[in-house]
């Protein structure tokens, strides 16, 4: 049932990462500059121009916190659940307050444990990702027998890791992924060079629970490296000349389900969304938006059709 704002209709398109950088293969233009975009050009000419600072000046936020901000949700570091939790929710993973959820990348290390590909080739066969995840789950045993881990591959190189212990765990720990730091509880990309290695997870506060959480993450990293080194799947990939899935870079820890005002309550309108990625599904679940799927990642015509159709019953998509 539509609200008092029933006449309002909004199709809200977020072009995540569209800015990009100039590239020599396209005459040092950005992909957006090089592309033929007559419809976007017309919208721009007839629209209003401005700058939106979604998180903070000079901060390149990850998609989760950026989307929340663009939808009007401003988190302080004590409030935000962490992207690991958002993606865990988006995958339907069994997660409860006190669990530690982290997002990660399958990555490739050389024989000196230097990261040579942060995404292990990026396009990873679903079967391989599922198989190595299952190997880790079956073979990894923490020193505390009451601790356990679940590893869920999502899309391409992406993976979710959930660690559960007899005690509630803390998100106040550093990333093992050297390309991302934590600023006020949010993941922020760092300017990094080559020859990076997996970083040791450290507690961000002097508490037993933060130290325990960091220790469990480090134990996961150390033991999963050994399992992946002997992995049947990696031996097969090596024989096929493919990038090895021989490490997981972890970041954005969280330990609680986010509690926020639903988006329909916030704006007194009916909201829906078109989602593809686990982080988008997680955001829609947290904000209680009706979610539509519309083809694959690049099926834009189908997405436009679904968006137009949704305007019959929704205020915004």
Feature locations, PLM:
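Beta-strand elements within well-structured catalytic alpha/beta cores of enzymes
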Residues: 8-21, 42-43, 237, 245-249, ...
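Hydrophobic alpha-helical scaffolding
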Residues: 8, 122, 210, 214, ...
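Short secondary-structure junctions
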Residues: 49-52, 142-152, 271-272, 288-295
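Glycine-rich, mobile lid/loop segments that gate access to catalytic sites or pores
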Residues: 120-247, 252-255
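Active-site nucleophile/metal-coordination loop of metallo-enzymes that catalyze phosphate/sulfate
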Residues: 2-7, 19-148, 156, 160-162
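Generic recognition of stable, solvent-exposed alpha-helical segments in well-folded globular domains
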Residues: 13, 35-38, 131, 215, ...
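Generic, well-ordered alpha-helical scaffold segments in large soluble proteins
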Residues: 46, 223, 227-231, 282, ...
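Anion-binding catalytic surfaces of enzymes that hydrolyze or transfer phosphate/sulfate esters
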Residues: 247-317
């Amino acid at each position: 049932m539509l609200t008092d704002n029933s006449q309002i209709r909004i199709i809200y398109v977020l072009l995540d990462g569209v800015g990009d950088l100039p590239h020599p293969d396209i005459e040092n233009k950005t992909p957006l500059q090089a592309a033929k975009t007559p419809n976007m050009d017309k919208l721009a000419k007839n629209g209003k121009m401005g700058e939106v600072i979604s998180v903070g000046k000079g901060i390149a936020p990850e998609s989760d916190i950026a989307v929340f901000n663009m939808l009007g949700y401003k988190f302080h570091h004590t409030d935000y659940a962490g992207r690991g939790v958002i993606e865990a929710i988006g995958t339907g993973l069994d997660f409860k307050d006190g669990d530690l959820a982290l997002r990660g990348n399958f990555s490739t290390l050389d024989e000196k444990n230097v990261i040579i590909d942060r995404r292990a080739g990026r396009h990873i066969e679903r079967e391989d990702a599922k198989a190595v995840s299952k190997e880790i789950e079956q073979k990894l045993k923490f020193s505390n027998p009451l601790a356990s881990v679940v590893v869920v591959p999502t899309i391409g190189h992406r993976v979710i890791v959930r660690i559960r212990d007899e005690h509630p765990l803390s998100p106040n720990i550093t990333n093992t992924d050297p390309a991302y730091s934590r600023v006020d509880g949010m993941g922020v990309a760092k300017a990094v060079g080559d020859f990076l290695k997996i970083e040791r997870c450290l507690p961000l506060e002097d508490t037993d629970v933060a130290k325990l959480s960091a220790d469990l993450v480090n134990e996961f990293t150390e033991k999963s490296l050994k399992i992946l080194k002997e992995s049947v799947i990696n031996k097969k990939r090596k024989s096929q000349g493919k990038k090895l899935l021989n490490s997981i870079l972890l970041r954005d820890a969280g330990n609680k389900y986010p509690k926020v005002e639903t988006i329909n309550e916030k704006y007194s309108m009916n909201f829906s969304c078109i989602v593809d990625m686990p982080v988008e599904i997680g955001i829609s679940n947290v904000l209680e938006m009706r979610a539509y799927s519309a083809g694959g990642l690049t099926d834009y015509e189908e997405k436009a059709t679904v968006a137009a159709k949704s305007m019959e019953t929704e205020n915004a998509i």
